[in-house]
Amino acid sequence: MPVLKKEIELSDGKKIWVRQASGMEKLPIENIQAKIFRKTRHFGADPAEWTPEQNEEFADMLDEAGGGMADQIQAWIPNCVIEPADFDINTLTSEEVRTILSFVRGDTLEGAVPLG
């Protein structure tokens, strides 16, 4: 599947173009996530069936290993906001960061078009 891009409207009405993180960009964090998942396989194969405590332990382990949400944001968002070229990512609100991250990592694809 190709890397996609999408126009996202910010809370102040500005629009930015964002692309998904590539496989090569995602690889280091995905490796961390896989290692932590293997360490917690005794929780069960389906994370949707884990207890809240198990989910919290998993999230804490991800954070400690460098694969948590903050790590994803820092690794991917600066490179994935592609237009305008001079956009200052430090002006994004927390809600905007979460919206962008959801697209960048491939959770939401609505309205996306191929990058090329």
Segments predicted by a language model, with ranges:
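Short, surface-exposed, charged amphipathic helix/loop patches that serve as local interaction elements
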Residues: 2-4, 19-116
